[in-house]
């Protein structure tokens, strides 16, 4: 029988590093993230699970869905794997997710 457990304590040990190098890595990481992700809008992050052998964002983009919108929910024009909030309701997001899944399945034969 599988038991449900809750982790209440974790110890993490990180290797030592040079402060300047670590800060430069952090700045570079944040720059790359800002280039690729729609950080100026509220979103729940990457929305669709990666299908085997493909990338959800690439499939969504190839189906011409970047910028698609239902109500206040929109497929990001910057990264098609993100649904951004432009004043949408939960119903808007659920409808947009279902629309994206239908279109990708029809055009690509892949379930997101």
Predicted regions and their residues:
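Phosphate/pyrophosphate- and phosphate-bearing ligand-binding catalytic cores of soluble enzymes
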Residues: 1-95, 102-107, 111-112
